[in-house]
Curated annotation (Swiss-Prot):
CDD domains per UniProt: homeodomain (cd00086)
GO molecular function: DNA binding; DNA-binding transcription factor activity, RNA polymerase II-specific; sequence-specific double-stranded DNA binding
Residues covered by region (Disordered): 115-151, 259-305
InterPro entries referenced in this protein's UniProt entry, alphabetically: GSH1/2 (IPR042191), HD (IPR001356), HD_metazoa (IPR020479), Homeobox_CS (IPR017970), Homeodomain-like_sf (IPR009057)
Chief subcellular location: nucleus
Name this polypeptide is given: GS homeobox 2
DNA-binding region: 203-262
Function according to Swiss-Prot or TrEMBL: Transcription factor that binds 5'-CNAATTAG-3' DNA sequence and regulates the expression of numerous genes including genes important for brain development. During telencephalic development, causes ventralization of pallial progenitors and, depending on the developmental stage, specifies different neuronal fates. At early stages, necessary and sufficient to correctly specify the ventral lateral ganglionic eminence (LGE) and its major derivatives, the striatal projection neurons. At later stages, may specify LGE progenitors toward dorsal LGE fates, including olfactory bulb interneurons.
Gene3D superfamilies: Homeodomain-like
Length: 305
């Protein structure tokens, strides 16, 4: 028996025998098959429906073997993620109309965009666990535009998978992050809360509480010399158990205070001179009034002489 006669008998038997009823599926979108689609992909999609293959038995007819080889072999241009995902969605003996590929593609987009942004592991978990599901679908008559729809959806899924293929481990910005002591962002974050505000260095400097002995020695040194050399400043700081910076700042403040006191004293002296002059002027006016001729005439008139 020749091979062509065996194939013809299978085709005649297939056309005479009514096709088994298959569960109804949701119709996919109607698109036209593009003319530039690769031939292995078209053969794997539009392969002949063998009765023994539909019933689940093992079939060794040439058409079934050829379609199986084309479906199991990856496409020649599979590179990156787009063509590989399209081959996994369409080939492999598990494509059915629009229902065999769409559930698989929807499973890849199951996490929300926010979840994919802050927790990329969720999308990877769905991506790795869902693809084995497409091997359990049964063969159905291929609709005219289901291959193009599956290819377009597979390309979109591949683009999303490529975008999520490199997860950014520092994506959750709002998570609890710990900065180093030298990082200026640490102070910004600490200023937002109220627990660590005591550790934030503010612009105010703590006042040094000098003892009476220290103040006495500093005043004595200032009365003898208002400006200190560095060696003398170090000696005083060591003797009084202070830092060199504390002694320097104290002398600076003391000089400012001394200048203010000098200005205040000069002002007081100037005002006191004015007061004395005004009092003398008033006295002279009073004497002149008492010695005026009118007053003398009055005295003369009152006098009995």
């Amino acid at each position: 028996m020749s091979r062509s006669f065996y194939v013809d008998s299978l085709i005649i038997k297939d056309s005479s025998r009514p096709a088994p009823s298959l569960p109804e599926s949701h119709p996919g979108p109607d698109f036209f098959i593009p003319l530039g689609m690769p031939s292995p992909l078209v053969m794997s999609v539009s392969g002949p429906g063998c009765p023994s293959r539909k019933s689940g038995a093992f079939c060794v007819c040439p058409l079934c073997v050829t379609s199986h080889l084309h479906s199991s072999r990856p496409p020649a241009g599979a590179g990156g993620g787009a063509t590989g995902t399209a081959g996994a969605a369409v080939a492999g003996g598990g494509v059915a109309g629009g229902t065999g590929a769409l559930p698989l593609l929807k499973s890849q987009f199951s996490p929300a965009p926010g979840d994919a942004q802050f927790c990329p592991r969720v999308s990877h978990a769905h991506h790795h666990h869902h693809p084995p599901q497409h091997h359990h679908h049964h063969h159905q008559p291929q609709q005219p535009g289901s291959a193009a729809a599956a290819a377009a959806a597979a390309a979109a899924a591949a683009a999303a998978a490529a975008a999520l293929g490199h997860p950014q481990h520092h994506a959750p910005v709002c998570a609890a992050t710990t900065y180093n002591m030298s990082d200026p962002r640490r102070f910004h974050c600490l200023s937002m809360g109220g627990s660590d505000t005591s550790q934030v260095p503010n612009g105010k400097r703590m006042r040094t509480a000098f003892t009476s002995t220290q103040l006495l020695e500093l005043e004595r040194e200032f009365s003898s010399n208002m400006y200190l050399s560095r060696l003398r400043r170090i000696e005083i700081a060591t003797y009084l158990n202070l830092s060199e910076k504390q002694v320097k700042i104290w002398f600076q403040n003391r000089r400012v205070k001394h200048k203010k006191e000098g200005k205040g004293a000069s002002r007081n002296n100037h005002t006191s001179c004015k007061c004395v002059g005004s009092q003398a002027h008033y006295a002279r006016s009073e004497d002149e009034d008492s010695l005026s001729p009118a007053s003398a005439n009055e005295d003369k008139e009152i006098s009995p002489l």
